[in-house]
From Swiss-Prot:
Gene: xghA
Active site: 70 (nucleophile), 480 (proton donor)
Protein name: Xyloglucanase Xgh74A
Keyword Electron transport part of the UniProt annotation: no
Native source species: Acetivibrio thermocellus (strain ATCC 27405 / DSM 1237 / JCM 9322 / NBRC 103400 / NCIMB 10682 / NRRL B-4536 / VPI 7372) (Clostridium thermocellum)
BP-aspect Gene Ontology terms: cellulose catabolic process; xyloglucan metabolic process
Length: 842
C-alpha cells in the first residue's frame, strides 16, 4: 500500500473565517544517497500496548471500524483477518506530531471517506500546527489541510469525543471541536478549507491544571452530534448538538444548521460532558465527570438523557450522585443502534477493586454492572476474560481478593456497540482494546466472553533495545510496560519483565558475558529498587539491596564488557557505578547529571562518557573518568555506542550535530561529512567479506530523512526505508542483529518496535577482493621463513602483543580455527622443515 500525500499544492489563505489550507506531496528525495529495498514489520508485542482513546464504527457499512491512538496514529479494522491495519506509518520524524490523533470520523454517506484531526500537543513540545487528514480510499492515501492552531491527541481529555463529525445528510459539511479557546470550526468542502463558527458562544473554560505546561490549556469543544432526522439527504442537517468542557453550560444546540447557537435549557451543571450519543428515539445520552481524564477520573460522575422532542432532562446515573460509591467519572458511552433503549457506560478509573461497565436495556431506568459483590471479598463476575493474545496483560503479578488479574482495564474512555451486530462490543483501556462477540448473553444470564481485540495494534513507546550475540534476538525496555524478551519476532511475549515497574527506560548487557543484563526503570512504589539484574538474558530479574545515590529511577545503564561493573545514570542524578550488583554504589568521578555513558565492548575496564561538551574515558571499571581533551566535539550527544570486537571504537550520535567516530578510545574524533543528522546509532552483523560491523542510524543524509546502513565503517551509506515507512519518532534506540546481516531493530515512540530486513531482491554485497598476504608470512615481506616462525613463538609466549602484519589472525592462524596457538606453530615449523608440502588451506 502506498500511503502518501498528493503533490498538488494550494496557497495558504489566512483570512478571518478561512483556515490555512495546504495539500502537500511527499518530500522530494535526493538521488545522491542510494536506496535498497527492505521489508518492514513490527516486532509483535501484541495487545496494543498503549492507550487507544477512541473507536469509531461506520454507521452505514458493516465491519468498517477505525481506532485512534494518542501517540501511535490510526488504524482500520480488517475483518478478513480480525486485525488492525496502521494507516499513518508514512509520517517521518519531522511530522511525528500527526501520530497524535485527536479525533477520527468515517463518512456515513460515502464510506470511502475518512478524516483525521491530527496533532499531538498544544504546547511547544512539538512545532507542528494541527492538521486535518483527508482520505477518499479508507486511509490508503491522504491529503492534508494545515490548521492555524494545534491539536492535542496526547493531551488531557483526549478520550472525550468525537470532536470531528460529518453531517449525515450533507457529507460536504464537517465540524471540528478545538482546544485552547479556538472554538468550533466548520468545513463545507469535504474538509479542504475550514472557517471558525463565529456565532458559537463558548470555546470552553475548563483547564485541568494551570500550573503545568502540559495541563494549562483549555480542553475546549469536545464533541459534535447531528440530529439526522432534522433534515433530508442532500441538505445540511438543521439540528446539531455540541458538548463543551465547561462546568456551567456545556451542551449547546443549533436548529438552523449552525447559524445560531444556544445553551440547552435545564441541563446539568458542575460536571464535564465526556460523550454524547443521539439515539434513534430522540434521546441524547451523555456521560459526565468531574474531570476530563484519562488519567484521573476520580471525583463524581453522572449519566443523563435529554429528550430532544420534549426538552426533558432525566438523571439515569447507575450509582446515585449522593452515594459514597459514586467516586469516579462516567466516560465511555454506547447505544445499541438496533435498540435505542440499550445503553452501556463505563467508569473512568475507579481502580479498586476494578472498573465498572454498566448495561441497561430499558433506557437507563435500571442497570447491571458487569460484576457485583458476593460474600466479601468475593465478587460475582458476569464475564470471562481471555488474554491469550497478549498474556503479559496480567502484568506478572497476582492480586489479593477482591482484586483479580487480569483486570477489566483502566482509562476506559470509550465503549462502542457494533451498529450492525448487537453482540459485538469493544472498549478501550490504557494498555489494549478489549471486546466480546456475545454481548447479549449477559441479558440472558450468561457470561460475556471478553478477549483482546487489539491484534495488529503496536502502540508502545519503546525506550531502549539490545540484541545480544546469544539468547533471544531482542530484549527491550518499554515505557509503561517495562519491557520484554522477544524470542520470536512474530509472536508476542508471554510475560513482561518482572518486577513490574511503571516504565523500563534503559537496558544493557555484558558483551563478553551476554546473559548478564541490567535494566533501569521508573516505579510508582518507593520501596521498589529501580534497577534489576539478570543472569539469564532477561528471563528472570533480581533487585539489589541498594540504589544509586539520590536516584528517583529511570535514566540509562551501561554494563562492562566482562560484567564486573555497571554504571547507572538516573534521570535526576550523577552516574554511579557498582561492582557488586548493587550492594554498594559510588558516584563516578568527574561526571554529573545528564552525562551520557557507554561501555567499551571489548575491555571490561573501559567506559566512555560525554558530559558538558567534553568526552571522558574510564580505565578502572567506571570509578573515575578523565577528560580526553578531544577537540572539536559536538555541543551535545544523544547516544554513545562502542563497537563490539573493536576496542576503542566509539561512535557518537549527536542529532543535528551529526555522526562522529573515534578509533582511539575517544582521544580524537572525526565527524562524518556524509551524514547530516544522526539521532541514534547501532551495530549489527558485518556484511559478507567485511570485518567491521554494519552500522545503522536514523537521521538525515543528503537532506533525506530516513534509516541508513553502512557496510564499510561509514564511508558509504544506503537508505533502507522508503516513504511508506517513517514511523514517526525514531530517536531513542536502534540496533542491528549481531547474528543476522541486514536485520535492524528500531524503537519508536508510539508504533512499538519495528524491524527491517533486506528484501529478496536486494543484492547481497560482493565481498571485496582484498589481498591479505600469505598465510604464514607474519612480517609482511611476502616470504615464509624462520623469521616468521620466531615471530609466532614470541606472539604465543606473549613476549609481543602484535604482529607486524595488518591482519594477525589471517597470517598466523594456520589451521583456520580462529585461534593462534601451538598448533599453528607446529604447522609452520613442519612446513619450513619440508615435513609437509603446504600449509592447510583455510
Amino acid at each position: 500500500m502506498v500511503k502518501k500525500f498528493t503533490s498538488k499544492i494550494k496557497a495558504a489563505v489566512f483570512a478571518a473565517v478561512v483556515a490555512a489550507t495546504a495539500i502537500f506531496g511527499p518530500a522530494i528525495s535526493s538521488q545522491a544517497v542510494t536506496s535498497v529495498p527492505y521489508k518492514w514489520d513490527n516486532v509483535v508485542i501484541g495487545g496494543g500496548g498503549g492507550f487507544m482513546p477512541g473507536i469509531v464504527f461506520n454507521e452505514t457499512e458493516k465491519d468498517l471500524i477505525y481506532a485512534r491512538a494518542d501517540i501511535g496514529g490510526a488504524y482500520r479494522w480488517d475483518p478478513s483477518t480480525e486485525t488492525w491495519i496502521p494507516l499513518l506509518d508514512h509520517f517521518q520524524m519531522d511530522e511525528y506530531s500527526y501520530y497524535g490523533v485527536e479525533s477520527i470520523a468515517t463518512d456515513p454517506v460515502d464510506p470511502n471517506r475518512v478524516y483525521i484531526a491530527a496533532g499531538m500537543y498544544t504546547n511547544d513540545w512539538l512545532p507542528n500546527m494541527g492538521a486535518i487528514l483527508r482520505s477518499t480510499d479508507r486511509g490508503e492515501t491522504w491529503e492534508k489541510t494545515i490548521l492555524p492552531f494545534k491539536m492535542g491527541g496526547n493531551m488531557p481529555g483526549r478520550s472525550m469525543g468525537e470532536r470531528l463529525a460529518i453531517d449525515p445528510n450533507d457529507n460536504r459539511i464537517l465540524y471540528l471541536g478545538t482546544r485552547c479557546g479556538n472554538g468550533l470550526w466548520r468545513s463545507t468542502d469535504y474538509g479542504v478549507t475550514w472557517s471558525k463558527v463565529e456565532s458559537f458562544p463558548n470555546p470552553g473554560t475548563y483547564i485541568y491544571d494551570p500550573n503545568f505546561d502540559y495541563t494549562k490549556d483549555i480542553i475546549g469543544v469536545v464533541w459534535v452530534v447531528f440530529d439526522k432526522s432534522s433534515s433530508t439527504p442532500g441538505n445540511p442537517t438543521k439540528t446539531i448538538y455540541v458538548g463543551v468542557a465547561d462546568k456551567n453550560e456545556s451542551i449547546y444546540r443549533s436548529t438552523d444548521g449552525g447559524v445560531t447557537w444556544k445553551a440547552v435549557p435545564g441541563q446539568p451543571k458542575g460536571l464535564l460532558p465526556h460523550h454524547g450519543v443521539l439515539a434513534s428515539n430522540g434521546m441524547l445520552y451523555i456521560t459526565y465527570g468531574d474531570t476530563c481524564g484519562p488519567y484521573d477520573g476520580n471525583g463524581k460522575g453522572q449519566v443523563w438523557k435529554f429528550n430532544t422532542r420534549t426538552g426533558e432532562w432525566i438523571d439515569i446515573t447507575p450509582i446515585p450522585y449522593s452515594s459514597s460509591d459514586n467516586r469516579f467519572c462516567f466516560a465511555g458511552l454506547a447505544v445499541d443502534r438496533q435498540n435505542p433503549d440499550i445503553i452501556m457506560v463505563t467508569s473512568m478509573n475507579a481502580w479498586w477493586p476494578d472498573e465498572y461497565i454498566f448495561r441497561s436495556t430499558d433506557g437507563g431506568a435500571t442497570w447491571k454492572n458487569i460484576w457485583e459483590w458476593g460474600m466479601y471479598p468475593e465478587r460475582i463476575l458476569h464475564y470471562e476474560i481471555d488474554i491469550s493474545a497478549a498474556p503479559w496483560l496480567d502484568w506478572g503479578t497476582e492480586k489479593q481478593l477482591p482484586e483479580i488479574n487480569p483486570k477489566l482495564g483502566w482509562m476506559i474512555g470509550d465503549i462502542e456497540i457494533d451498529p450492525f451486530n448487537s453482540d459485538r462490543m469493544m472498549y478501550v483501556t490504557g494498555a489494549t482494546i478489549y471486546g466480546c462477540d456475545n454481548l447479549t448473553d449477559w441479558d440472558r444470564g450468561g457470561k460475556v466472553k471478553i478477549e483482546v481485540k487489539a491484534t495488529g495494534i503496536e502502540e508502545c513507546a519503546v525506550l531502549d533495545l539490545v540484541s545480544p550475540p546469544e539468547g533471544a534476538p531482542l530484549v527491550s525496555a518499554v515505557g509503561d510496560l517495562v519491557g520484554f524478551v522477544h524470542d520470536d519476532l512474530k509472536v508476542g511475549p508471554k510475560k513482561m519483565h518482572v518486577p513490574s515497574y511503571s516504565s523500563g527506560t534503559g537496558i544493557d548487557y555484558a558483551e563478553l558475558v551476554p546473559n548478564f543484563m541490567a535494566l533501569v526503570a521508573k516505579a510508582d512504589l518507593y520501596d521498589v529498587k529501580k534497577i534489576s539484574f539478570s543472569y539469564d538474558g532477561g528471563r528472570n530479574w533480581f533487585q539489589p539491596p541498594n540504589e544509586a545515590p539520590n536516584s528517583v529511577g529511570g535514566g540509562s545503564v551501561a554494563v562492562a564488557a566482562d560484567a564486573k561493573s555497571v554504571i547507572w545514570t538516573p534521570e535526576n542524578a550523577s552516574p554511579a557505578v557498582t561492582t557488586d550488583n548493587g550492594n554498594s554504589w559510588k558516584v563516578c568521578t568527574n561526571l554529573g547529571m545528564g552525562a551520557v555513558v557507554a561501555s567499551d565492548r571489548v575491555n571490561g575496564k573501559k567506559f566512555y562518557a560525554f558530559y558538558n561538551g567534553k568526552f571522558y574515558i574510564s580505565t578502572d571499571g567506571g570509578l573515575t573518568f578523565t577528560d580526553t581533551k578531544a577537540p572539536q566535539l559536538p555541543k551535545s550527544v544523544n547516544k554513545i555506542k562502542a563497537v563490539p570486537g573493536k576496542e576503542g571504537h566509539v561512535w557518537l550520535a549527536a542529532r543535528e550535530g551529526g555522526l562522529w567516530r573515534s578509533t582511539d578510545g575517544g582521544y580524537t574524533f572525526e565527524k562524518l561529512s556524509n551524514v547530516d543528522t544522526a539521532h541514534v546509532v547501532g551495530f549489527g552483523k558485518a556484511a559478507p567479506g567485511q570485518d567491521y560491523m554494519a552500522i545503522y542510524i536514523t537521521g538525515k543524509i543528503d537532506n533525506v530523512l530516513g534509516f541508513f546502513r553502512s557496510d564499510d565503517a561509514g564511508k558509504t551509506w544506503v537508505r533502507i526505508n522508503d516513504d511508506e515507512h517513517g514511523y514517526g519518532a525514531v530517536d531513542t534506540a536502534i540496533t542491528g542483529d549481531p547474528r543476522v546481516y541486514g536485520r535492524v531493530y528500531i524503537a519508536t515512540n508510539g508504533r512499538g518496535i519495528v524491524y527491517g530486513e533486506p528484501a529478496s531482491d536486494e543484492p547481497v554485497p560482493t565481498p571485496p577482493q582484498v589481498d591479505k598476504g600469505l598465510v604464514g608470512d607474519l612480517n609482511g615481506d611476502n616470504r615464509i621463513n624462520s623469521t616468521d616462525l620466531t615471530l609466532m613463538k614470541r606472539y604465543i609466549l606473549k613476549s609481543i602483543e602484535d604482529l607486524p602484519v595488518e591482519d594477525d589472525l589471517w597470517a598466523a592462524d594456520i589451521n583456520g580455527d580462529g585461534k593462534i596457538n601451538s598448533t599453528d606453530y607446529t604447522y609452520l615449523k613442519k612446513y619450513l622443515l619440508q615435513a609437509i608440502p603446504e600449509l592447510p588451506k583455510k
